[in-house]
């Protein structure tokens, strides 16, 4: 169900001095907030898990980030919480000068990720946005060169698009340097795709969207659309036999690719054992999907036989079993 539709809203705009909301019944509602009078028009908008509206405004001189908690009453602004911030301070107390805000996304943990002309900013506790002592976080990535130094994540990149995949990883599209796949905590760059090392049509990324069931990542560039088959999908809420599927199955002698198991819950602990109960391989699902290269812990291709896939949630309270057949 569409997030806007579930709240009875059709679309949200900034028109002149107000936030204009097109209701599902076709009527317009205008919400007036003094702090956005001089702001440029809204760019990207999202509703987070709390139902709060976040809207970007990208101009350096008059742009920023607007947040609105309308408390479920569109027509009554007297109980609203709202704030438009144009000057951001990081966790070290440093003022981020000449900042332009381009995009925004909420991850699986409710953390807000903001794309700017100076890399990504993170709101680990979005409810503090209305506080006077609010600050954003610039993730520090250690250099791991014995210097003890760290660099801010993608600080020299202009971030045009951010999308969150089923494993809570961040797909970050830049204005001129392709697309990055960043680990869930932001500390590791898993992939960096450019037009030089991948089928990307351009290093200028305009938008990113991810199909929740298949994990396919659709990347809009300045020269057209391209897709990439990711190894993470949206997780299931619970294990169901009808949702769990392994493919290819059986695995035939001429197949050398990965075996995929879908229908997992988030961060499933997965073990593959033979019929004697010996552990062959284990790992953690990426969102709702787990992949295996068909090899044991020593790196050798497994023998002909039936292998059991034992999956359990991260707390060990729920699990499921499926089978994979190998033919050699």
Positions of predicted regions on the chain:
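Short, glycine-anchored, charge-dense loop/turn motifs used at functional sites
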Residues: 269-280, 307
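Glycine-centered tight-turn motifs at strand-turn-strand junctions
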Residues: 279-302, 313-317
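Glycine-centered coil/turn sites that cap beta-strands in beta-rich domains
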Residues: 238-271, 289-292
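C-terminal tail/sorting-segment detector
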Residues: 308-328
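Blade-level signature of beta-propeller repeat domains, shared across WD40, Kelch, NHL, RCC1
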Residues: 119-121, 204-239
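Single conserved hydrophobic/aromatic residue that forms the stacking wall/gate
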Residues: 2-13
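Residue-level detector of Asp-centered blade-edge/turn motifs that repeat once per structural unit
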Residues: 47-50, 106-109, 164-167, 210-214
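Short loop/turn segments immediately following beta-strands, especially the blade-tip
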Residues: 24-28, 68-79, 124-136, 183-187, ...
């Amino acid at each position: 169900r569409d997030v806007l539709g579930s709240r009875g809203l059709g679309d949200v705009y900034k028109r002149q001095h107000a936030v204009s909301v097109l209701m599902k019944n076709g009527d317009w509602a205008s919400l007036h907030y003094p702090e956005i009078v001089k702001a440029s028009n809204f760019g990207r908008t999202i509703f987070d898990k709390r139902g709060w509206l976040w809207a970007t405004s990208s101009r350096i001189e008059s742009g920023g980030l607007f947040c609105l908690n309308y408390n479920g009453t569109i027509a009554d602004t007297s109980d609203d919480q709202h704030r438009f911030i144009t000057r951001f301070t990081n966790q070290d107390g440093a003022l981020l000068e000449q900042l332009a805000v381009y995009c925004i996304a909420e991850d699986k943990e409710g953390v807000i990720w903001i794309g700017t002309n100076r890399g990504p900013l993170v709101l680990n506790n979005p409810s503090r946005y209305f506080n006077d002592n609010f600050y954003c976080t610039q993730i520090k990535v250690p250099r791991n060169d014995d210097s003890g130094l760290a660099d801010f994540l993608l600080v020299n990149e202009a971030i045009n698009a951010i999308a969150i995949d089923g494993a809570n990883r961040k797909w970050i599209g830049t204005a001129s340097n392709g697309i990055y796949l960043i680990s869930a905590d932001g500390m590791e760059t898993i992939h960096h795709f450019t037009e030089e090392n991948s089928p990307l049509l351009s290093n200028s990324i305009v938008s990113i969207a991810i199909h929740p069931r298949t994990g396919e990542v659709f990347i809009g560039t300045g020269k057209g659309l391209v897709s990439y088959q990711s190894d993470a999908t949206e997780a299931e809420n619970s294990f169901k036999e009808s949702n769990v599927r392994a493919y290819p199955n059986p695995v035939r002698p001429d197949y050398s690719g990965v075996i995929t198991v879908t229908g997992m819950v988030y961060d499933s602990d997965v073990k593959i054992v033979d019929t004697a109960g010996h552990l062959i391989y284990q790992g953690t699902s990426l969102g709702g999907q787990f992949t295996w290269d068909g090899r044991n812990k020593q790196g050798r291709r497994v023998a002909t036989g039936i292998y059991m896939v034992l999956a359990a949630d991260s707390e060990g309270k729920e699990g499921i079993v499926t089978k994979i057949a190998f033919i050699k």
